[in-house]
């Protein structure tokens, strides 16, 4: 089996219409990602959002669609690598597939895994597809909740749900204006239930 130079793999998790494509398009358009070499983008499902040909050309990105989960195996992926010869790989993962069973070629190394979640539909998926959602979240370095405009009061509960599965993940909340700088009570270095709040020197930055 073909085994070439080590490749960095970036996996973007999320259910259909969660905003994965929007996130990847934004990433490809950033100067920090326009590094030497070419990128292979593997789509595991086709959403309504499309990738503009101009962006693909400008970011030196090839794109391939794999809609059959069985084709996402080390042998097939090694053949694809040999065909496209990418320097790095982005996988837009199908949230309905079993991530636990996913195996990559031996020279593919996971560089980063992120999960994108539509905050407006999170309760539905959390209630009805908890095991699939947990599999996406468990090994992700970052969880991005978008479309938070109408669910601001629910964000502390959403955060606790995520932390119950992955305590170390960074959690980002976004609305139509961008990232929400939300400070949660459990992150504060003091107890709000006490009559007197005592700040240590590390706490002053929060009030700045």
Give a label for each model feature.
Residues 2-112, 116-124:
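Nucleotide-state-sensitive switch-loop elements of NTP-binding domains
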Residues 151-208:
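C-terminal accessory "lid"/substrate-recognition subdomains
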């Amino acid at each position: 089996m073909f085994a070439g130079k080590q490749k960095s793999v970036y996996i973007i998790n999320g259910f259909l219409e969660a905003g994965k494509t929007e996130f990847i398009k934004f990433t490809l358009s950033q100067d920090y990602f326009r590094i030497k070499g070419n990128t292979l983008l593997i789509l595991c499902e086709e959403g309504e959002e499309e990738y503009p040909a101009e962006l693909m050309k400008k970011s030196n990105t090839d794109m391939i669609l794999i809609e059959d989960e069985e084709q996402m195996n080390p042998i097939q992926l090694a053949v694809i690598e040999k065909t496209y010869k990418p320097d790095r790989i982005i996988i837009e993962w199908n949230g309905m597939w079993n991530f636990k069973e996913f195996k990559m070629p031996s020279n593919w190394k996971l560089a980063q895994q992120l999960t994108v979640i539509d905050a407006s539909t999170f309760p539905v998926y959390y209630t009805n597809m908890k095991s699939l959602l947990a599999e996406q979240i468990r090994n992700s370095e970052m969880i991005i909740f978008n479309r938070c405009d109408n669910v601001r009061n629910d964000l502390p509960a959403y955060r606790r749900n995520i932390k119950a599965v992955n305590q170390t993940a960074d959690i980002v909340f976004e609305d139509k204006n961008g990232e929400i700088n939300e400070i949660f009570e459990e992150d504060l270095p003091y107890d709000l239930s006490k009559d007197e709040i005592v700040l240590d020197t590390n706490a002053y930055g929060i009030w700045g």
